[in-house]
């Protein structure tokens, strides 16, 4: 399969589910250096550009119906005690090695729900009520990257073996898998929302334009490679978002919290999985160059060594522990 075929399949997925699912999910996986994140961003850009080209050419405004209240989305997330909230505000380091910690929420002064897992506030998710603005940029596709759920360096400092945690940063246990899974569950619920019933448009684009709804605004962290840490609220989903592109190394990993991500998304009945592949030589060159550009190493040679001592180990973990029975498309990216 090539990239253009992937893009067509995503449009087809949306068309096939436009009357039953408010959103559809695309899961992009691949080894470090395969180019999965670049592919996810390219897909987001192209889907949005094609939709925006349609908007410029059409006459008439968008139809926006009443939607779902924010409170209904997080109702199954337990409310944190005052002591737990205070602990979160102070850093929340005591739970950093607990993959069984259940995410909790608290409410800011403006009523916004903040959901946090074992990584504390740096990896938190925010849910708010905010009216859609038809005059704003209408992006129907957004990426949901795993990268924003890297545990912060301050949290890695509190591991029993902090040196190993820093050296193996990027391994499954150095992420807030608790809260990334919680985010995936929340977003899977939004995929199952039923779009407003309207006469079907002549084209998929017209049907999309007629079935937008007011939805909770969901913010989640990204990752700043220069600062080497997660950034709160870097990514935002609104009611305009109809395609969710999940991007990450461990989205089909069959251990601890990671093992439940695919099943949560598959429960929507509207999911597509693509594995982006590349040769080990290509991946090594890409990752070594990236490490050097990010200032993580002092030379390309050091970048190669870091790849072999960390990233390659993570790739082998994936090969040994991938969920079975998942229909997966293969996209070669050498």
UniProtKB/Swiss-Prot annotation:
Xref: Gene3D superfamilies: P-loop containing nucleotide triphosphate hydrolases (3.40.50.300)
Entry keyword annotation includes Transferase: yes
Domain of life per record: Eukaryota
Alphabetical keyword list: ATP-binding, Kinase, Nucleotide-binding, Transferase
MF terms in GO: ATP binding; ATP hydrolysis activity; kinase activity
GO cellular component terms listed in the entry, alphabetical order: cytoplasm
Binding site for ATP: 30-38
EC numbers: 2.7.1.-
Cysteine disulfide links: none
Enzyme class: transferase
KW Membrane (keyword) present: no
Free-text function comment from the UniProt entry: ATP-dependent kinase that could be involved in endoplasmic reticulum membrane assembly.
UniProt similarity note: Belongs to the YFH7 family.
Protein name: ATP-dependent kinase YFH7
Source organism of this protein record: Eremothecium gossypii (strain ATCC 10895 / CBS 109.51 / FGSC 9923 / NRRL Y-1056) (Yeast)
